[in-house]
Every structure is written in C-alpha cells, then in structure tokens.
Design a protein with these regions (language model features):
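Positively charged
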Residues: 1-157
Length: 157
C-alpha cells in the first residue's frame, strides 16, 4: 500500500497523537523495532521506530521511540551492507538477507511538525530504510536479490 503525505499543520496540531499511540501499542504487542501506517492499512507517510541495543543485541547507539512523518532518504555514498531482516507484515517468515545503504540522509517531520534532516548509519539506517520502504509500498522481500536466504517460522508439511 503506497501512502500519501501527511499535512504539516495536522502534525503540528497533534491530530495524529491517538493514531501514534495505537501504532506504538501494536509495535510493542508484536515486539517490533518499527511500524509504519501502511502496515495497519492506513495510507499515511508516518512510522514509529526505536533502536534498543539491549534487546536487539547490536553494538549501536540507542534511539528512543521516534515518530517520523513524510520521511524520505537518500544514500550517502554507494556503500551497502547485507544483513537479515524480518517484518511484522510477513509473520510466517523469520526473515532474509537484504542489502541496504550503510549511511543515509533522512528528511522528515517530527511529531511536533518540525522539519528534520539527519544522517544515520549501520542498523539505525537499516531500520529507517525498512520503514520508509513501507511508506512506498515495499516490503523487505522486494529488496532481496534472491530468496535463498529466506527462513520460515513454522514447518510446513
């Protein structure tokens, strides 16, 4: 599901706070790192995410729960890394190996409607690319060069 941009004035007024609370509840209920509005059948360019190295076993800086509206990104250099990803939208799959840009520049609005521009690297950049893909109607499977690394959460047969 492709999403449409969110009105900056509506973000500034706090019109989406109840929706963000629902998104957070869903993300936590399913132990997600992030969740985008299209994943709950709402075609808006908004997502929540957090990077918690303690639970994700990554050598990364923490990023507190963050809401981004109308987010876009561009790569900072051609360097890419491959790593495993999974997704709440594809619950029957454990995940697969996905190449992502190592460093990206993000432009978005925060939950107060202020413009943001920042760089992210490593796992933080991977999470952002994954969530922004949802806003563009993509899932991680669309980014996989081959499906050989896919792992299922249940056995069939």
């Amino acid at each position: 599901m492709r999403s449409r941009e969110v009105d900056t004035r509506a973000v500034s007024r706090g019109d989406y706070e109840a929706f963000l609370a629902d998104l957070e509840h869903t993300m936590r209920e399913y132990d997600g790192t992030g969740i985008a509005a299209p994943q709950v059948f709402t075609p808006l360019r908004v997502f929540l995410y957090e990077v918690n190295p303690e639970t994700r076993k990554r050598n990364e800086k923490s990023v507190p729960l963050t809401a981004l509206f109308n987010a876009t990104y561009e790569p900072v250099g051609p360097e890419m890394e491959e790593d495993s990803e999974g997704c709440l939208s594809v619950p029957f799959l454990w995940g697969g190996v996905v190449p992502r840009y190592q460093t990206i520049r993000v432009r978005a609005l925060d939950r107060a409607g202020r413009s943001l521009a920042f760089e992210a690297s490593g796992y933080h950049a991977r999470v952002l690319q994954h969530e922004i893909d949802h806003l563009d109607g993509l899932v991680y499977l669309d980014r996989m060069p081959d499906m050989k690394s896919l792992a299922y959460t249940v056995k069939f047969g």
